[in-house]
């Protein structure tokens, strides 16, 4: 089988002479047409520090492809900064960017008959967008994560971007001085790289090591460090070899490898967004995987990493402690990973982990042995009940008791809720309900980091519940339940909640319940009318029309 089995459709034969003319304009030589064409999907952007350090990785990948006797074809992919758009209408474009990125990569890879694709990304939706594209096209591919940011520091305290969000609540509550507020603001993000805790970007990139689609150790490297550049080059070399072996994404992305990825997400205390994204990745790969599978894995896998947002450390600390391979070796030895899954190197996961120590080093407390796990079960619980018949996702780490029953405080938009929080109108025992923010209703299922961080900054993180059909940032912790499905816009029960209704969140019982009699709910349902769509033109309108429910990944195909 030729190495250029796809690109030969666009480069070989008399009829393709005009095509070759255009390649000659790019500097190609005649002998290049028998070599594979390797796309380099470059997410470099100066929109956000998450992506501002990607060009050097793309340059390294291009050089490595050339050195491997293949032809690099670099093209761009867009990004949205979740952190910068948070709390604004711009946040509605975040999840949509996942689909746009996937479509961009699919369009270039398929339209140009690429033989393989190196995907390079940084901010949150870059990772699932790229992986969806690779799974959907089944073109040989590898994911190169841009790397994490280094922690900031103010007065001896390590900072992340979440420090800035929480400072808003602390400052408005009078619990932080103006000097400290500005000091945190100026110092939270000192370098290029993605947000530093086990937030969404680091969650997804870490899980890609376990999935088998990224090189070991690559997900916890810091973007400014030379090893990140070296890893990008090595990733490109590995991808060219995968093309020559005809090793495709769907050979790697299987039900068992997704289970491995989810196990690592649970063990590291990762983001709720991973639930949505792995439902979408599985859909793209044609793998049967449901929201209930996350709960099945959660009940088996303990949390063994002490990482922000609910823990103490950041990704650079995890890297120094042994990285994701150390986490995986512990899980593998405990029978919690499938070691026979093939990886992008062609080796099995067990073979890749053969030289990793069986136990974490004793001189660190970032990665813990299973017998000293922070939590005996995973932290992303799937709740169901009359308020979420299809399911909802709760993040239950960092809480003394993940149970609350209290009066509903109902808001149909994020800004109204934020105003109420900052004005001290939300009290201990309340359950905030933010609705009409789901995939169709938002549209785009915006994240709620600003209000949840404000609640924590006000000192209410343990005592106020938060329920939404939108999403939460990977930086969120507290009594939070998101991804409520069915969403309000399609008439889900969350649309029927009224101010003062009693709501129960019980992570132990995996219950999300509106404590209102059935006959009253039936009366409200009969009176409910679907609101007009917020957008009727453009990408938001298209997404709202096409998207599935959150319980199926909010996919558009």
Curated annotation (Swiss-Prot):
<dbReference type="GO" id="GO:0009099">
    <property type="term" value="P:L-valine biosynthetic process"/>
</dbReference>
<dbReference type="Pfam" id="PF24877">
    <property type="entry name" value="ILV_EDD_C"/>
</dbReference>
<feature type="binding site" description="via carbamate group">
    <location>
        <position position="125"/>
    </location>
    <ligand>
        <name>Mg(2+)</name>
    </ligand>
</feature>
<feature type="active site" description="Proton acceptor">
    <location>
        <position position="473"/>
    </location>
</feature>
<dbReference type="InterPro" id="IPR056740">
    <property type="entry name" value="ILV_EDD_C"/>
</dbReference>
<dbReference type="InterPro" id="IPR037237">
    <property type="entry name" value="IlvD/EDD_N"/>
</dbReference>
<dbReference type="GO" id="GO:0004160">
    <property type="term" value="F:dihydroxy-acid dehydratase activity"/>
</dbReference>
<feature type="binding site">
    <location>
        <position position="123"/>
    </location>
    <ligand>
        <name>[2Fe-2S] cluster</name>
    </ligand>
</feature>
<comment type="pathway">
    <text>Amino-acid biosynthesis; L-isoleucine biosynthesis; L-isoleucine from 2-oxobutanoate: step 3/4.</text>
</comment>
<dbReference type="GO" id="GO:0051537">
    <property type="term" value="F:2 iron, 2 sulfur cluster binding"/>
</dbReference>
<keyword id="KW-0028">Amino-acid biosynthesis</keyword>
<dbReference type="GO" id="GO:0000287">
    <property type="term" value="F:magnesium ion binding"/>
</dbReference>
<comment type="function">
    <text>Functions in the biosynthesis of branched-chain amino acids. Catalyzes the dehydration of (2R,3R)-2,3-dihydroxy-3-methylpentanoate (2,3-dihydroxy-3-methylvalerate) into 2-oxo-3-methylpentanoate (2-oxo-3-methylvalerate) and of (2R)-2,3-dihydroxy-3-methylbutanoate (2,3-dihydroxyisovalerate) into 2-oxo-3-methylbutanoate (2-oxoisovalerate), the penultimate precursor to L-isoleucine and L-valine, respectively.</text>
</comment>
<dbReference type="GO" id="GO:0009097">
    <property type="term" value="P:isoleucine biosynthetic process"/>
</dbReference>
<feature type="binding site">
    <location>
        <position position="447"/>
    </location>
    <ligand>
        <name>Mg(2+)</name>
    </ligand>
</feature>
<dbReference type="InterPro" id="IPR050165">
    <property type="entry name" value="DHAD_IlvD/Edd"/>
</dbReference>
<comment type="subunit">
    <text>Homodimer.</text>
</comment>
<keyword id="KW-0456">Lyase</keyword>
<feature type="binding site">
    <location>
        <position position="124"/>
    </location>
    <ligand>
        <name>Mg(2+)</name>
    </ligand>
</feature>
<keyword id="KW-0100">Branched-chain amino acid biosynthesis</keyword>
<dbReference type="InterPro" id="IPR042096">
    <property type="entry name" value="Dihydro-acid_dehy_C"/>
</dbReference>
<dbReference type="InterPro" id="IPR020558">
    <property type="entry name" value="DiOHA_6PGluconate_deHydtase_CS"/>
</dbReference>
<feature type="binding site">
    <location>
        <position position="82"/>
    </location>
    <ligand>
        <name>Mg(2+)</name>
    </ligand>
</feature>
<keyword id="KW-0001">2Fe-2S</keyword>
<feature type="binding site">
    <location>
        <position position="195"/>
    </location>
    <ligand>
        <name>[2Fe-2S] cluster</name>
    </ligand>
</feature>
<comment type="similarity">
    <text>Belongs to the IlvD/Edd family.</text>
</comment>
<keyword id="KW-0479">Metal-binding</keyword>
<keyword id="KW-0460">Magnesium</keyword>
<protein>
    <recommendedName>
        <fullName>Dihydroxy-acid dehydratase</fullName>
        <ecNumber>4.2.1.9</ecNumber>
    </recommendedName>
</protein>
<keyword id="KW-0408">Iron</keyword>
<dbReference type="InterPro" id="IPR004404">
    <property type="entry name" value="DihydroxyA_deHydtase"/>
</dbReference>
<feature type="binding site">
    <location>
        <position position="50"/>
    </location>
    <ligand>
        <name>[2Fe-2S] cluster</name>
    </ligand>
</feature>
<feature type="modified residue" description="N6-carboxylysine">
    <location>
        <position position="125"/>
    </location>
</feature>
<dbReference type="Pfam" id="PF00920">
    <property type="entry name" value="ILVD_EDD_N"/>
</dbReference>
<comment type="pathway">
    <text>Amino-acid biosynthesis; L-valine biosynthesis; L-valine from pyruvate: step 3/4.</text>
</comment>
<keyword id="KW-0411">Iron-sulfur</keyword>
<dbReference type="InterPro" id="IPR000581">
    <property type="entry name" value="ILV_EDD_N"/>
</dbReference>
């Amino acid at each position: 089988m030729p190495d250029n089995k796809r690109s030969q459709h666009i480069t070989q034969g008399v009829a393709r002479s005009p095509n070759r003319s255009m390649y000659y304009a790019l500097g190609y030589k005649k002998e290049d047409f028998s070599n594979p064409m390797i796309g380099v999907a470059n997410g470099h952007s100066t929109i956000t520090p998450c992506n501002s350090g990607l060009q050097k990785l793309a340059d390294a990948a291009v050089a490595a492809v050339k050195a491997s006797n293949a032809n690099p074809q670099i093209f761009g992919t867009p990004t949205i900064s979740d952190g910068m758009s948070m709390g604004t209408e711009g946040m509605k474009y975040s999840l949509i960017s996942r689909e746009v990125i996937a479509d961009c990569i699919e369009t270039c890879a398929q339209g140009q008959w690429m033989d393989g694709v190196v995907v390079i990304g940084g901010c949150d939706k870059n990772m699932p967008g790229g992986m969806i594209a690779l799974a959907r096209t089944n073109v040989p591919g590898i994911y190169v994560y841009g790397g994490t940011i280094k922690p900031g520091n103010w007065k001896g305290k390590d900072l992340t971007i979440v420090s800035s969000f929480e400072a808003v609540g602390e400052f408005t509550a009078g619990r932080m001085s103006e000097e400290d507020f500005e000091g945190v603001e100026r110092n939270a993000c000192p370098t290029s790289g993605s947000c530093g805790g086990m937030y969404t970007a680091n969650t997804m990139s870490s899980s890609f090591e376990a999935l088998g689609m990224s090189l070991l150790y690559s997900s916890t490297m810091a973007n400014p460090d030379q090893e990140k550049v070296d890893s990008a080059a090595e990733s490109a070399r590995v991808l060219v070899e995968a093309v020559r072996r005809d090793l495709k994404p769907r050979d790697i992305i299987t039900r068992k490898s997704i289970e491995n990825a989810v196990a690592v997400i649970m063990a590291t205390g990762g983001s709720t967004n991973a639930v949505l994204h792995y439902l979408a990745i599985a859909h793209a790969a044609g793998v049967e995987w449901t929201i209930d599978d996350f709960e099945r894995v959660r009940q088996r896998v303990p949390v063994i990493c002490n990482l922000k947002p609910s823990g103490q450390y950041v990704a650079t600390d995890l890297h120094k402690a042994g990285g994701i391979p150390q986490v995986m070796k512990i899980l593998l030895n405990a029978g919690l990973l499938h070691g026979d899954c093939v990886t992008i190197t062609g080796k099995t996961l067990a073979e890749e982990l053969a030289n990793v120590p069986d136990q974490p080093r004793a001189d660190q407390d970032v990665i813990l042995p299973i017998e000293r796990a922070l939590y005996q079960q995973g932290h992303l619980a799937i709740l169901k009940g009359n308020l979420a018949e299809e399911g909802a996702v709760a993040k239950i780490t960092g809480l003394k008791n993940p149970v609350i029953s209290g009066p509903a405080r109902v808001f149909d938009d994020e800004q109204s809720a934020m105003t109420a929080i900052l004005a001290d109108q939300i009290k201990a025992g309340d359950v905030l309900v933010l609705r009409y923010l789901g995939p169709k209703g938002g549209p785009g299922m915006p994240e709620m980091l600003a209000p949840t961080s404000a609640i924590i900054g006000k000192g209410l993180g343990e005592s106020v519940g938060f329920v939404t059909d939108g999403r939460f940032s990977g930086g969120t912790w507290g009594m939070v339940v998101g991804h409520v499905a069915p969403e309000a816009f399609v008439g889900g029960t969350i649309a029927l909640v009224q101010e003062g209704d009693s709501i129960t969140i019980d992570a132990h019982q995996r219950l999300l319940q509106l404590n209102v009699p059935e006959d009253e709910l039936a009366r409200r349902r009969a009176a409910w009318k679907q609101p007009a769509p917020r957008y009727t033109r453009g990408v938001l309108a298209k997404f709202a029309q096409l998207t599935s429910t959150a319980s199926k990944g909010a996919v558009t195909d």
